[in-house]
Amino acid sequence: HEVGTPNLAGILGLGRAAEWMNYLKYENFKEHFTGLDFAMSDSDIFNIKGLDLIYKDYRQNGRYVYTFTCTGYHPSDVSAFLGLDNIAVRVGKLCAHPIVNKVSGGRGVLRISPGIYTSKEDIFKLSDSLCKAIQKLV
């Protein structure tokens, strides 16, 4: 961009994002995320051997973030298998090296962060994919 040239693409993108948020009705977000949390509980994710929930963060907008340690396999390996099923998770030390090193023995953690675009079916697909990935790794 030249000096003084407005960022038209950014302005238009922000406008479309605002329209999308209004279309989704922000007040429905909390209900959506609570439903996803129930789907997480109904799935087998919390019962997968070696996948231990260490942190469940409830955000003000009703969104949940789940952080797991992996015993017997590396979280990056799990992430690679999930990627084969088009599932993205965050792995590593998540900019919290001292605490993650302490809880994971230096291996890192696996974080699941459902979004407004995540469906309950996505949660069950994630559960199935996690089970398949871990069976292959153990």
Identify the meaning behind each predicted range.
Residues 1-138:
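Pyridoxal 5′-phosphate
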